[in-house]
Curated annotation (Swiss-Prot):
Binding annotation for S-adenosyl-L-methionine: 67, 72, 89-91, 116-117, 132
Known EC number: 2.1.1.244
GO biological process: methylation
Keyword Cytoplasm in annotation: no
Function recorded in the entry: Alpha-N-methyltransferase that methylates the N-terminus of target proteins containing the N-terminal motif [Ala/Pro/Ser]-Pro-Lys when the initiator Met is cleaved. Specifically catalyzes mono-, di- or tri-methylation of exposed alpha-amino group of Ala or Ser residue in the [Ala/Ser]-Pro-Lys motif and mono- or di-methylation of Pro in the Pro-Pro-Lys motif.
Entry similarity comment: Belongs to the methyltransferase superfamily. NTM1 family.
Reactions performed catalytically: N-terminal L-alanyl-L-prolyl-L-lysyl-[protein] + 3 S-adenosyl-L-methionine = N-terminal N,N,N-trimethyl-L-alanyl-L-prolyl-L-lysyl-[protein] + 3 S-adenosyl-L-homocysteine + 3 H(+); N-terminal L-seryl-L-prolyl-L-lysyl-[protein] + 3 S-adenosyl-L-methionine = N-terminal N,N,N-trimethyl-L-seryl-L-prolyl-L-lysyl-[protein] + 3 S-adenosyl-L-homocysteine + 3 H(+); N-terminal L-prolyl-L-prolyl-L-lysyl-[protein] + 2 S-adenosyl-L-methionine = N-terminal N,N-dimethyl-L-prolyl-L-prolyl-L-lysyl-[protein] + 2 S-adenosyl-L-homocysteine + 2 H(+)
Top enzyme class: transferase
Protein name (record): Alpha N-terminal protein methyltransferase 1
Pfam families: Methyltransf_PK
Domain of life: Eukaryota
Disulfide bond residue pairs: none
GO cellular component, one term: cytoplasm
Amino acid sequence: MSSRLHNGNDVYEKAEEYWSRASQDVNGMLGGFETLHTPDITVSKRFIEGLKKRNLFGSYDYALDCGAGIGRVTKHLLMPLFKKVDMEDLVEELIVSSEQYIGSDPRIGEKFIEGIQTFAPPERRYDLIWIQWVSGHLVDEDLVAFFKRCVKGLKPGGCIVLKDNVTNHEKRLFDDEDHSWTRTEPELMEAFNGADLDMVVKTIQTGFPKEIYPVKIFALKPRRQETSDDN
């Protein structure tokens, strides 16, 4: 797969440089496409509520926002739903800016300043782990390893959600500006399988301009968890 042609550490360093230069506002977090914010949050909220109705995660107690930036998703999607939300991001300046963007709020838990290529969520803490527009920065082996660490971060019955661009081309595409890959859906399914995750729900983002890559949302459950009653 093409990510093996790139050195992971080199890609990660360049991605950090890119996001360190991004404006610390919603427009910066969305790569200049601020108008995506409202339809993005609307569809994501509907997706989470649908998961809860189907009992695909236990409660609205604790969520984790991976690649949180200044906290756009934390503030507008997760905080209105969950009692407590932790944030993770590689860029310290963005996490620091989140305090001003979100304000002081007891629903904000820990803020982790670390890249997802090494970040290990606290074990058995989260009902929902939300991963949006950040997985494309990881090479294949690091993506699978990250998913495995996320599984350990789930409470029993918890759920992982991946929301990201997906290409309809035969092969993934590499963005030389932000140093990320847009993977194909079969490549993502391969990564899920490598981490023993089953994709239990999938939807496509609506309301985005046609020139934007398709954005899909995947709900993932640990395979062993799903089959434990049969063992």
